[in-house]
Amino acid sequence: MSRVGKKPVPVPAGVTATVDGQTVKVKGSKGELQFRVPDQVAVTHENGAISVQPRSQTKEARALWGLSRAQVANLVEGVTKGFEKKLEINGVGYRAAVAGKVLKLSLGYSHDIEYEIPAGITITTPRPVEIIVAGIDKQRVGQIAAEIREYRSPEPYKGKGVKYADEFIFRKEGKKK
């Protein structure tokens, strides 16, 4: 039995949620999101909460039960609070700047990398070595942060590169003479 799936997702005041068949639509102060729940799972909206139940007891249905409940909870949290990922840049001369709808990254290559900021996502650089990716869709925020990190992922000897703010880089010792 899914411990995550058992709990109904409370819908706070100021948020409207509608369940139309297998589609859950959530509208809040920050925007509107929708998610299509897999067919193996039934979703209902009652008493100010959205509950998710498996249609059968197959292993796949039970796995999708917890996943679907977590996805619906992320929709509600996204339209109320939003999500953000912080990235840090380590390395001499490595920096980032936002110019309009473009994130400009100087990461030690012969050219600057220009990353087009997608709609629905805000990227800010409070300092030249700090990037904050924010939005209402948790999956997109994480995906964009991962794409930015991928341009120069941290290396294990000096730790140079783009890393998540809470990420620990396992360091290696250099060659010995």
UniProtKB/Swiss-Prot annotation:
Q: Which Gene Ontology BP terms does the record give?
A: cytoplasmic translation
Q: Which InterPro entries match?
A: Ribosomal_uL6-like (IPR000702), Ribosomal_uL6-like_a/b-dom_sf (IPR036789), Ribosomal_uL6_a/b-dom (IPR020040), Ribosomal_uL6_bac-type (IPR019906), Ribosomal_uL6_CS (IPR002358)
| Alphabetical keyword list | Ribonucleoprotein, Ribosomal protein, RNA-binding, rRNA-binding
Q: Which domain of life does this protein belong to?
A: Bacteria
* Keyword DNA-binding part of the UniProt annotation: no
Q: Which GO terms describe its cellular component?
A: cytosolic large ribosomal subunit
Question: Would the keyword RNA-binding turn up in this protein's UniProt record?
Answer: yes
Q: Which GO terms describe its molecular function?
A: rRNA binding; structural constituent of ribosome
Per UniProt, subunit arrangement is: Part of the 50S ribosomal subunit.
* Family membership noted in the UniProt record: Belongs to the universal ribosomal protein uL6 family.
Known role: This protein binds to the 23S rRNA, and is important in its secondary structure. It is located near the subunit interface in the base of the L7/L12 stalk, and near the tRNA binding site of the peptidyltransferase center.
Listed name of the protein: Large ribosomal subunit protein uL6
Q: Which organism is it from?
A: Methylobacterium nodulans (strain LMG 21967 / CNCM I-2342 / ORS 2060)
